[in-house]
Amino acid sequence: MVVAAVFLALYAICIKFSSLEGIGSFEVLFYRSFFGLIVFYSVMRFKHITVHTVHMTDHMIRSFMGAGAVMAGIYSIAHLNVGLAMTLNYTSPLFIGCFTIGILISQHKGINWKLLSTLLLGFLGVVVMLSPTITPDEYFAATVGLLSGFCTAVATTYVKRLGLMKEPELRILFYLVLIGSLCGLVGTMLSGGFTIPTTTAALAIAGFAICSTCGQFFLTIAFSRGNLVLSGALQYTVILFSTVLGVWIFDDSVSLTAIGGMIMIVVAGISASYFTRQEKQKELHEKKHTEEGLQRHLRHQSARDH
């Protein structure tokens, strides 16, 4: 997971370089996605995995929300300090926690006050981090950064849903980069076309394309083979790496108050992931208990009939 975090931090740095060289956000989305499209489709062909699926609606929702998350993340990185932008991009556990609270209320199961308190801490951290740091003309970019976290949360729920449907991970990633490529291409054409890259921009494009693919690869390995709780906590090291690199390379200014807000968001994100997982395990346990009770009742009824 730490290796994945390093690649994702470098990905953010390369995006910042490309934006400074005049490469638009839609262009970045296209280059990033198209490189992934070539890689993932090639691996699918090698492993004899087809693109055909009977769950196309779920793939499309996941892919459009995922592409939206990537696009929003790219925009926020281009217009904010790298560390701040990456922190906002990693607020998805807070939104997933909000979804969980909403489900609990809709099912009349009461509120998980620990989870709710954690969410309040996280969103308070966002306010603390941004209030002394950004200027009024950066409010929109900060809002877009939060939108990235929201879109990631929705996309994540559909990734889990597709996983339960036994959809291969490569197929899920394929449709994400396919939609990302199409959205990036259309957006670029509508916003004036492609920019002829300078040497620095070309290197930045190659850098974020490679780093994003490598980061996604190691991220998948960490969550599929490692400890989920530990991996979930270690993924936040990307904020540390991004902040340090942003200060070192771009001379980003990060106040102590902003650092305090970042810490609040990280603590809240890790805690929200833990409490959300607890709620899901509790739900599975209750479902299993109900099914076992029903089976006992049916066996008892069958014995009485005989």
What positions do the PLM features span?
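Transmembrane alpha-helical segments that form core, pore/gating elements
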Residues: 16, 40, 133-192, 284-306
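Hydrophobic transmembrane alpha-helices of multi-pass small-molecule transport proteins
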Residues: 99, 111-131, 257-276
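Loop-to-transmembrane-helix transition segments
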Residues: 1-4, 48-74, 140-148, 188, ...
